[in-house]
A protein has these predicted regions:
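Phosphate/nucleotide-binding beta-alpha loop and adjacent structural elements of enzyme active sites
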Residues: 1-237
Length: 237
């Protein structure tokens, strides 16, 4: 019963957190209609539902590295005409990476997991799991870059990119060497906990985006997590 109440509480707080984001997008950035939205790290479709409910979207492309999650998405959204689901892993270059597929799939990541993390222990306790439950398994996944995907699919302008890839956000942005000039707005999540071993800091992302003419306009802490969500917009010429 306690676990059920906790999950309900988290759901409610997440709802208000997301509402804060969409209110900013609409009221401050004046974004109501979108031609192309890239949803990177689609998971089980949370952001697909969120953006579809709140914005008028002509075309959404959702990327999900996990084959299992992608199969789920293709079944769930088989009748959604403005949605393309891609079982592709995006990174800074083409190749292969080891993907840590977690039983609690929202934590799946290309980053190395710190098994001694206090945050991980708290999370596993919250989910009523133990290390004996094989919390994650390793898979080799092929990667590509956003530059290559956009070029191959003749996409020359993107209104909004959302990135939530559990510690791989910077690598994805680095795969935008050419086409970053064609992106208008970027929403991404950044972890400050010790569960994920990242080889970059928030300052690295911030400096990269500033160098490419983006400005940070929004920051909000995610409920009950050591993570923040940020919004950056392209500077007007």
């Amino acid at each position: 019963m306690i676990k059920q109440i906790t999950f309900i509480t988290l759901f409610i707080f997440d709802h208000f957190h997301k509402k804060k984001i969409i209110n900013y997008v609409k009221n401050k950035l004046d974004i109501y209609s979108i031609n192309i939205l890239l949803d990177i790290g689609a998971h089980k479709g949370e952001s697909i539902d969120f953006f579809s409910k709140n914005l008028n979207i002509k075309k959404m492309i959702s990327f999900e590295a996990s084959p299992d999650n992608c199969d789920f998405l293709k079944t769930k959204y088989r009748n959604k005409k403005n949605l393309i689901i891609e079982n592709k892993a995006l990174s800074s270059k083409e190749g292969e990476l080891i993907f840590n597929q977690c039983n609690e799939s929202s934590s799946s990541t290309f980053s190395e997991i710190n098994e001694n993390s206090k945050y991980l222990r708290k999370k596993m306790n919250f989910l009523n799991m133990s290390k004996g439950d094989n919390f994650f398994k390793k898979q080799v996944i092929k990667t590509t870059t956003l530059d290559k995907y956009l070029y191959d699919n003749h996409i020359f302008n993107v209104d909004l990119i959302k990135i939530d890839t559990e510690g791989h956000e910077f690598e994805i942005l680095k795969g935008l060497k050419i086409n970053i000039k064609n992106i208008n707005t970027i929403i991404f999540e950044h972890h400050y906990d010790d569960m994920i071993k990242k080889n970059y800091t928030f300052s690295d992302i911030n400096n990269f985006l500033k160098k490419n003419s983006f400005t940070k306009v929004f920051k909000a802490k995610m409920p009950f997590r050591k993570s923040f969500e940020y919004i950056y917009v392209k500077n007007k010429q």
